Each structure stands twice: as C-alpha cells, then as structure tokens.
C-alpha cells in the first residue's frame, strides 16, 4: 500500500544512483564531461574600500546575529535579513547598498514588524521571495542600528564610486576569452540578487554583448520569452536562482557562478540546467570566490571534506552525498557562526561532516541493492498487513 509509506520510514533505505555512469544502448556515456574552474578574486588598492565594506558588514552581521540567536524564534526575520546581507556584500556593492538603504528607510519610518517566518522555512525560502518581509524585521536596538547602517551606507557609496567591483574584471576577461574562441557558445551567469543582475547586465551591454535576464519577479510569459530570446538571439543569460528553477538550458554549456551559494546542493541544481542528457558539448563551470573572506575559508574546508567523501564513494557530484532536506540549514549555520570567527570553521563543520559520513556509510552498505531482483509479493504480503519497516529491512538483507 503506497499510502502507508512516509519519508521517515524509507529515508534510511534511499539510494542515490550515480547518474554520470549512465550509458546508452551502445555503451556510450550519456553525460558529457564537466570541467570546473575556480576563479579566485583578490582585492587590491583599487578595491580597498570594498574590502573595508566587507569587513564592516561582516562585523555588523556577526554581532547582530549572535544577539538575535538569544531569541531565535522571535527574531527569525531578522536572522534571515542578516543572512541576506552577508551574502550580498560578496555579491556586489550595488546589491548591499540597495538593501542597506531600504532597511534604513524602514527603521526611520518605524515600519518594522515581527513577521511570521519560522525556522523550518529557512531551508525552503528563496532569497527573492523572502527579502521583502526580512527588510521589515523588528530591530534589536533601533537607534544603534540606524547609526550603524548610516556608517555602512556611507562606506558603500564611497566603494561604489571608487571603482567597479573586484569580481567584474575577471568576469569580463573570462567572457571575452570564451566568446572570442567560439562565438556560438552561450554563457549563463547565475547570481542570487536582482540588483547584481541589473549591475552585470549594464556592464555587459556596454561591453557590446547581447544579454537576456531572468528572475523570479517575471511572469510565465516573460520567462518563456526570455528563454526563447536566449536560445535564438543572445549570447549571455543572467539568471537568479528563483528565475532559473526548472529550466532546461542544455543548448548552453558554460555556467558562471558569479555568486556561490552557501549550500552545495544549489550549485548542483544550477549545473543541472545544462549538465544533462542531450548536452552536445563538455560543460564548463566557473566558480567565482573572493579569496580574503570567511566564506572562502569555509568553502576550502568544506571541499576538503567533501572530496574525501566523494573519492571514497567514487562519484563526483555533491548531490550523490548530501541530503537536500538538511543541507541548507546546516550550511547556513556554519557560515553564519564562522563570520568573524574564522578560526572556528573546522569546529563549526563537525555536525555537517558527521551527517555526510553517515550518508556515506548508508550508501556504501546499500549500493548494490538496486541491482538485485526481489520478489515483492513474497515480502509485503497483503495490503491489510503490509509492514513497511519489516518489508524494507527484508529487502536489504
């Protein structure tokens, strides 16, 4: 009886197959090669104010986050806002400045509210969907926050006028190299924020490129029109995560992750838009990261641990290891607790590492089960006395 089966009962027995091993009737691999390029960005004298902005925002976020955790349930909207701000400051100066200015206006107009965001919503909530409520989160100390925001906004304005963001030059260099080599290639740029999307669109159009954008605020008709435009007319497609959900973009083979999500599963979801059956070219993924950040340190340690697990499993995809139901909350907490405490990264990753190792153990134990033939009729009996737990355990013995 299928209705008797619930996720909690079958989760220990779920097996993620390694789809990159899939072959056609002739024994040919169905997936093309995936080549990942890490593009590490350094702040130099031209971007020293951007570095200062990162440090100031991170200090503000870390301090406020630790205070908000004292009453986590009441402060969930504020916690989400702080997460957004920390992500924005490494995305673009335009994005963080816009968000800070909106937050300041809310406080000055006293439009704050507690909000109804629950902790269990965090792993499902998309940034584009939740930012409006988060901006109006109740303040822990309104006068202090107003003063801090004014200082950060002032620095953001200076950084914005000092020079273009540090990530821009490497982005333009990569795109120039890719498209000068083969003008028929199509490039997809992923960002988490509409403000960054707009910023990049203006830069690339001014560079002479044809650009299509897609975000979660667009209607179905607008999304379809954007897809058709990119497929037939333009070279570059800039999408937010919300805009890119469910898209099949296998006619493109270049992805640039201008913003790296904290959750590796989200990176896999992006790559899956082009890295799928039917892709005719090798897939190239360019991951942009600012080197002198806590985010990069977390990424380094996390990838070290993941590489060990992936090697032991003989797979090369995060999605074959991580449980998407828990990954977002776990990784978000790791990053937020590490902001301002870089020396604690290893310690903060212990729970995540334990979860991954447990999934590895399960995968190794049950990997061959799907290749075995089982007589289900003998195992489950009749519908009236169907015992899910015992049936599954019998299958796995």
Label every model-predicted segment:
Residues 2, 6, 49-53, 57, ...:
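Helical mechanochemical/support elements of P-loop NTPase systems and associated helical scaffolds
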Residues 281-397:
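C-terminal accessory region of SF2 helicases/translocases
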């Amino acid at each position: 009886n299928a209705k008797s089966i619930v996720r909690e009962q079958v989760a220990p027995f779920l097996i993620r197959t390694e789809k990159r091993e899939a072959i056609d009737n002739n024994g040919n691999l169905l997936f093309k090669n995936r080549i990942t390029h890490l593009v590490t960005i350094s702040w130099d004298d031209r971007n020293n104010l951007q570095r200062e902005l990162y440090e100031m925002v991170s200090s503000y976020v870390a301090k406020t986050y630790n205070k908000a955790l004292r009453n986590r349930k009441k402060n969930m909207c504020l916690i989400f806002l702080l997460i957004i701000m920390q992500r924005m400051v490494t995305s673009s100066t335009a994005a963080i400045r816009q968000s800070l200015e909106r937050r300041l206006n809310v406080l000055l107009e006293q439009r704050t509210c507690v909000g109804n965001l629950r902790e269990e919503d965090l792993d499902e909530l998309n940034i584009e969907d939740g930012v409006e409520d988060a901006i109006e989160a109740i303040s822990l100390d309104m006068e202090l926050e107003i003063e801090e925001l004014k200082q950060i906004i002032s620095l953001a304005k200076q950084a914005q006028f000092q020079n273009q963001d540090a990530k821009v030059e490497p982005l333009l260099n990569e795109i120039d190299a890719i498209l000068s080599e083969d003008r028929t290639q199509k490039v997809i740029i992923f960002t988490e924020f509409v403000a960054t999307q707009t910023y990049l669109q203006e830069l690339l159009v001014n560079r002479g490129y044809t650009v299509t954008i897609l975000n979660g605020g667009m209607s179905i008709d607008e999304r379809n029109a954007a897809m058709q435009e990119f497929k037939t007319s333009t070279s570059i497609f800039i999408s937010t995560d919300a805009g890119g959900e469910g898209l099949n973009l296998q006619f493109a083979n270049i992805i640039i992750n201008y913003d790296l999500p904290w959750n590796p599963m989200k990176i896999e979801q992006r790559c899956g838009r082009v890295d799928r059956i039917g892709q005719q070219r090798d897939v190239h993924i360019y991951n942009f990261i600012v080197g002198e950040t806590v985010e990069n340190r977390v990424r380094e340690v996390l990838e070290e641990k993941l590489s060990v697990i992936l090697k032991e499993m003989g797979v090369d995809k995060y999605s074959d290891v991580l449980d998407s139901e828990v990954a977002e909350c776990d990784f978000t907490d790791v990053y937020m607790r590490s902001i301002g405490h870089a020396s604690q990264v290893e310690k903060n990753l212990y729970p995540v590492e334990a979860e991954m190792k447990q999934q590895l153990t399960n995968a190794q134990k049950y990997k061959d089960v799907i290749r075995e033939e089982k007589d289900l009729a003998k195992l489950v009996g009749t519908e009236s006395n169907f015992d899910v737990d015992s049936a599954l355990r019998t299958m796995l013995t």
